[in-house]
Amino acid sequence: MKKTDMILSPSSRWWAAILLAASASFIAYAQSKLPTDLYPQSRARLPYLKKSDMDAKGQKIFDTLPGAGKDDILRGPLAFSAYNPAVAQALHDLHDAAVPGGTLDPHTRELAILVACRETNYNLEWNAHEAIGLKAGIDARLIDVVRYNRPLAGLNEKDATVIRFGRELFHDRKVDSATFAKAVELWEKRGTMDMVAVMSTYAVSGYFAIAVDEHSPEGKPELPALK
């Protein structure tokens, strides 16, 4: 490809600027329509917790949790489960056992996380793990299959199995015998249960986000409604 092929014409640059501005305006408009029962800082029905909100035992747990800032405010995926600090600690331990402590390769693990976030409309972790998934080698077109709940035709066997497994687990609430058998064939018994654990840990945080109607941070996109 010639260098000149990469240069946009003035007209193309103008249209690109218009589309970018329109996209930004749409996000700003959507976020201006937030429900009235949300706290501005957390963009959820509950405020972020401060360390001073907790008793002595809770404060010790607070110091161990990811998302605890220098301002002593807890943000991130454990922000709302930490209303019971022991639950937040348990979820953190589950994450560490399932994700870094599991046997799944990064590609499979990140795809499983994206499926769990998609099935629970979990914007916070979706936005973080979409970028991580791309770095792990997940193609952007595959991510869009998950994002838009598209058919699995044309996907390779492993990717299709991860997505099908997650959709059956969360949407159908019943994993088909053939789907389970294929997962065991691909990742063995331990790997299949590791996949369930990975999906579960992100889904649980997603359920907390659903309960408090957590919205994406300002300027960040939100997942489209599942069809």
Range-by-range predicted roles:
Residues 2-16:
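Bacterial N-terminal signal peptides that target proteins for export
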